[in-house]
Amino acid sequence: AKPRRTIRFMLWSGEEQGLLGSKAWVDQNPELLDKISAVFVYDGGPNAIAGLPATAAMKEDFETVFTPAMNLNPDLPFKLTDVDGIPRGIGSDHESFLARGVPGFFWTQEGRADTWHGIHTQFDTFDLVIPEYLEHSTTVIALTALGVGNLDGLLSREGMLEEGGGRRRGGGGGGRRLGVMLEGTTLAEVIPDSTAAKAGMKAGDKILKIGDEEVTDRRS
């Protein structure tokens, strides 16, 4: 099937050192950014792709794009999570694009793999791959690329970012990357193997305080 728009497969180096490769690309290609419908980063280990966040303005297009993924395998369900803005602070290469106003997404992944020992280390070897998860995830990615590429227009950027830029506490500098999707101060979703997951945080939990400071909104 030939898509209506170009689909690019891109590999980045220097993510762990500060998103060096993706930042360099967006800096060197500013004239292309307004033409990019969306960026999807697959870099979360061997578990199966299980979902994405969706803003209200994107929801209709995303329901069209992801209906095939939702019907792909009942044992590996896929869902869209309604959010006020695309979460930031995960620390992967889609954030280089979000910072320049391009919709960027990091897949939610679920499954039986314990990725913390291997991912992004010298222990990240082929024996950690789970074939059925990889086959499912690559199929979801292919369907997504084709679906977004065949939309009538670009994916909406209206209300794309979380209020205040959606950055993690502490601004662009310090602070730990929790790895959560927020609705207000409530955790809508917790990314597996993230700092939040390791701390025992779960979807539905509400952030009330950080240290001795009360949290009333995402800008607190």
Predicted region positions:
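Alpha-helical metal-binding/catalytic segments enriched in His/Glu/Asp
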Residues: A1-L19, I141
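Structured segments of extracytoplasmic/periplasmic soluble domains
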Residues: K2, Q28, L32, P68-L76, ...
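His/Asp/Glu-rich mid-to-C-terminal helical/loop segments that flank catalytic regions of hydrolases
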Residues: R5, T115-G164
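A fold-wide structural signal in alpha/beta-hydrolase
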Residues: T6-R8, P103, K206
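Metal-dependent peptidase/peptidase-like ectodomains
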Residues: W12-W116
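Soluble non-cytosolic domains of exported or imported proteins
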Residues: E16-L20, A56-E60, P87-G91, L128-T139, ...
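Solvent-exposed, polar/charged alpha-helical surfaces in well-ordered, non-transmembrane soluble domains
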Residues: K23, T64, P68, E95, ...
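C-terminal recognition in membrane/secretory proteostasis and scaffolding
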Residues: G118, L155-S220
